[in-house]
Regions:
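A short helix-coil junction within the Rossmann-fold of NAD(P)-dependent oxidoreductases
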Residues: 1-9
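Residue(s) in the substrate-gating loop at a strand-loop-helix junction
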Residues: 18
């Protein structure tokens, strides 16, 4: 599809990552690493594709109310009980779609939704060390809540 977009002089590639691709996520190291790779790929392709008239966006959603949000397992333990203890409920799919499409229409490179995920990303960019300490405390809470192990 890239050659066709290049030949026509325009196009828009949209990749899906996660807020975990921008902010390290406790007890989800492999998932977080894979999503960081999607973000890096997208940002690199964005720089390369611009001269061909091709835009690239990467979607980095927080917890969206999809089956995945209700079935994701943390390393060494389940997810049961985690969603109900989060500061805010999973974001509605319909609203997520609206915000994603608005970001694509504005040709944003990185689209972070909902606002809570965006706040988390801003906090991480401002102070990675402070977020590391918060993440370290979150590990204990998640392990206790889910029975996740330390490996």
């Amino acid at each position: 599809f890239y050659p066709r977009m290049r030949d026509q002089g325009h196009g828009h590639i949209v990749n899906t990552a996660s807020i975990s691709g921008l902010v390290p996520t406790s007890l989800m190291a492999a998932y977080s690493a894979s999503k960081h790779a999607v973000v890096a790929f997208s940002e690199t392709l964005r720089a390369e594709a611009e001269s061909d008239g091709i835009h690239v966006s990467v979607i980095c959603p927080g917890i969206i109310d999809t089956p995945m949000a209700h079935t994701t397992e943390l390393r060494g333990g389940g997810s049961e009980g985690v969603l109900g203890k989060l500061p805010s409920p999973p974001f509605p799919v319909e609203e997520a779609v609206k915000q994603i499409l608005a970001g694509v229409a504005k040709r944003r490179g990185i689209i972070v939704i909902p606002k809570e995920a965006n706040a988390l990303w801003r906090a991480y960019r401002k102070s990675p060390e402070a977020m590391l300490r918060i993440n370290q405390k979150t590990v204990g809470w998640l392990r206790k809540l889910t029975g996740a192990d330390e490996t």
